[in-house]
Swiss-Prot record:
Sequence ranges of Polar residues compositional bias: 212-223
Chain intervals with Basic residues compositional bias: 150-162
Chain intervals with Low complexity compositional bias: 118-149, 186-211, 244-256
Segments passing through the bilayer: none
Listed name of the protein: Uncharacterized protein DDB_G0286175
Length: 391
């Protein structure tokens, strides 16, 4: 009666348990037809039965459409054959709400042309509307913006249409335009007041911006970024055992010892010359600043006596030179410069003559140079006192 099916699970994806047809059921979304003559889907649940159910529904729809068309045709035939009867007048909602203002005759089954609806009195429809004007002020930094809806003199009923009007008063635009110019005039006035008061410290600070430092220790920032070059190592690096000191016997320098000493002296001399040039440039800049300050002081003190002007210039020059020496922090403070001269014209000459005294590196005098034995060139020399440098 029943088919016995082995439902033992297997690991093969191709083998699946098979069920007989009598255990299969119809999905719940399929509704069987109401016609008792049609085959039931429970008896033959197959694609053919589903197709038959769909065909049955289509036939039922066609029958319903035909019946509807027949009813419409019958209705049209009845309307054409029967005479048209006039409609009875129906009272409106206004008449029901206002029975005293409008009088109507009693309802009659048939309306005749002689029937007249008499209207005794109608209430006049008067509408009044009050509109309010509101003004809102939004404070801004420089402009006052006033928001106010327009006021309509006409009357409206239950509808308000506010129109937004923006009033911008540009009262402060002139002040805004004059701000940069006003700031500039204030700066100029401050400079004039400082010059009239002979404030030497402020004049030095103002003149420092015009200094042209051409030394390596300058305030200027390079525009192009400094990029380290890519070092190429065609050969492998030497082992740590090969990195010995020059005094070790295993080292084989490419240049003799005397030539290396000469190169070291040349390097020290070049560094001293560069330092001399830097100090000379700094002294020249200081002298230029002093001359500019003297000119400003002379122009501001035209009304005073000549003797007082000369004395003030000498005092101001000394103070300015000392202040400049203390304010220049880029170069090392070596020795106090011998620049306390009363005459401005002699500053450059004194600086050129005192270059050897400014540099402390040249204070160590080199002893008498002795030509070593076996050397034919007098340039390759040695000294009794050597300067130890980490070269």
């Amino acid at each position: 009666m029943y088919d016995v099916v082995d439902l033992t699970p297997t690991y093969s994806p191709t083998l699946k348990p098979m069920l007989s047809q009598q255990y299969q059921t119809v999905p719940p979304f399929i509704i069987p037809p109401n016609d008792p003559n049609s085959p039931s889907p429970l008896s033959s649940p197959s694609l053919l039965s589903l197709h038959q159910i769909q065909m049955h529904h289509q036939q039922q729809l066609q029958l319903l459409q035909q019946q509807q068309q027949q009813l419409q045709q019958q209705h049209q035939n009845q309307v054409v054959n029967q005479p048209i009867q006039p409609l009875q007048p129906q009272p409106s909602a206004f008449l029901l709400n206002h029975p005293n203002t409008i009088t109507t005759p009693p309802l009659q089954p048939m309306m005749t042309p002689n029937t007249i609806i008499s209207i005794n009195s109608l209430p006049p429809t008067t509408t009044t509307t009050t509109t309010t004007t509101t003004t809102t002020t939004i404070p801004n930094n420089n402009n006052n913006i006033t928001l106010s809806p327009q006021h309509h003199h006409g009357q409206q009923q239950h509808h308000q249409h506010p129109h937004l009007r923006v009033d911008i008063s540009n009262n402060n635009n002139s002040v805004v335009d004059q701000l940069p110019q006003q700031q500039q005039t204030n700066v100029n006035n401050n400079n004039n007041n400082n010059n009239n008061n002979n404030n030497n410290n402020n004049s030095n600070n103002n003149n420092n911006n015009n200094n042209d430092f051409s030394t390596p220790n300058s305030f200027s920032v390079p525009t192009t970024p400094m990029v380290a070059p890519q070092m190429q190592f065609p050969q492998p690096p030497p082992p740590l055992s090969a990195l010995n000191t020059p005094n070790n016997s295993t080292s084989n320098p490419t240049t003799p010892r005397n030539e290396r000493d000469l190169l070291r002296r040349l390097a020290v001399a070049n560094s001293n010359n560069n330092l001399n040039n830097n100090l000379n440039n700094l002294n020249n800049n200081n002298n230029n600043n002093n001359n500019n300050n003297n000119n400003n002081n002379n122009n501001n003190n035209n009304n005073s006596n000549n003797n007082n002007i000369n004395n003030n210039n000498n005092i101001n020059n000394n103070n300015n030179l000392n202040n400049n020496n203390l304010n220049n922090n880029n170069l090392p403070i070596i020795q106090p410069l011998n620049l306390n001269n009363n005459n401005n014209n002699n500053n450059n000459n004194n600086n050129n003559n005192n270059n050897n005294l400014i540099n402390p590196f040249l204070n160590e005098a080199i002893d008498e140079q002795v030509v070593p034995k076996g050397s034919t060139s007098p340039l390759i020399t040695s000294s009794k006192k050597r300067i130890k440098l980490n070269v």
